[in-house]
Amino acid sequence: MRAKQTVVVSLGQRVCGAVSLNPPGVKSSVKKAAKRRVLLQRSAPDIARAVRQMAGDGGEAKRLPKRPFHGEVEENSSAAVDGNVKIQPGKKAPGERRGKENSAAKCTGLTSGSAEAKMEQSVHGSQTTDPSVFFDEDSNHVFPVEQFFGNLDVVEDYPRRTPGSKRMTRREYRSMHYYAKEDSEEEHL
């Protein structure tokens, strides 16, 4: 980074020039290139460890499935999809998509090992969620109240008013809230 600075020499002459704010002999592009080189030389586990350390990860990485970095090789997932087809490391399969759902499916697919187990998981997964429960936002469906609030027959119906109280007429209400004007001595004179 450079800043323009005017220097007044002892003879009264002014000299204009650019003065570097960096240490002498070091340009900012050189610093950036050195940082870039250091980051590229780090391995993926080192970077992940540093990120977890900075973020204060409380062991969540052990509970959650690992999502590969963009440049990381996914040899196990390509071999599990089809054992006969070999894909070059670093390239994605044509049907492979990015996202949380797909990465979770890859992790479960790696542990199951066979296509039959994957089919059982997908069939079991479709049975747990009932699509009839979720309606469109724009539809006029009546929502099942019991599903959200439980059995409403158990809840007692409370009357609005207690049976001992009677309805007050307008005249009675006004007479209760009437404030008489104070008599002033000046008006009586």
Swiss-Prot record:
Pfam families: UPF0688
Stretches for region Disordered: 53-137
Gene Ontology CC annotations of this record: nucleus
Major subcellular site: nucleus
Domain of life (superkingdom): Eukaryota
Keyword terms, alphabetized: Nucleus
Keyword match Nucleus: yes
Subcellular location: Nucleus
Basic and acidic residues compositional bias, start-end: 59-73, 93-103
Signal peptide: none
Cystine residue pairs: none
Family in the record: Belongs to the UPF0688 family.
Name the UniProt record assigns to this protein: UPF0688 protein C1orf174 homolog
Native species: Danio rerio
